Design a protein with these regions (language model features):
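Membrane-spanning beta-strand positions in outer-membrane beta-barrel proteins
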Residues: 1-3, 37-41, 123, 127, ...
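Surface-exposed loop/interface segments of Gram-negative outer-membrane beta-barrel transport/assembly proteins
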Residues: 13-20, 24-119, 135-174
Length: 174
């Protein structure tokens, strides 16, 4: 017999430039020839998440809550307005702002996480005689994640680029 299914999930986030997408599949195949049964189960999934820093001090949500609603998002020339924020400002120095323009923060930063997971199993079973069967199975579980984070130097705080890949070399086989 067989069973195959596929799924797609797409959710837009509450904050500008945030969303989550997931693609997944499941496949089960099995068969029998006389007293010999065999099969395979396979389930891969891939997801991508565009995250926005919404946590704590300096996050998009806190900045949106702390900014006065009369503070314009853009200057007359179309650039982002950072000067309406007097919170923590020292003269013309905006490097110490804990609260920034939340729209600029959401648009000038990215935090993308890609995840891949695969779970699979192959099995076989033979019945030698009624009441005595031998079953063998091999399975594996792989998970990989890639995170790419960027913060534009246009934001008044420190501009930075961060790249990271993590892996578990123990899980590799050849």
């Amino acid at each position: 017999g067989y069973f195959v299914s596929a799924n797609y999930y797409d959710k837009e986030g509450v904050v500008i430039n945030s969303d989550f997408k997931k693609y997944s599949m499941r496949m089960n195949l099995d068969g029998q020839y006389k007293k010999f049964k065999f099969g395979v189960n396979f389930s891969p999934s891939y997801s991508t998440s565009n995250r926005v820093d919404a946590s704590g001090a300096g996050g998009v949500v806190q900045s949106a809550l702390m900014m006065p609603p009369v503070w314009p998002v853009y200057n007359a020339d179309g650039s982002y307005n950072y000067q309406g924020n007097g919170y923590w400002r020292i003269g013309n120095d905006y490097q110490h702002n804990a609260i920034l323009n939340p729209v600029a923060m959401a648009n000038l930063q990215s935090d993308v996480v890609d995840r891949m997971a695969i779970v699979g199993k192959v099995f076989a079973e033979i019945e030698f005689f009624k009441g005595l069967t031998y079953n063998i199975s091999f399975g594996g579980d792989y998970y990989g994640s890639h995170n790419d984070t960027y913060r534009s130097s246009e934001l008044p705080l420190l501009g930075q680029k961060y790249y990271d890949t993590k892996s578990n070399p123990i899980a590799y086989s050849s």
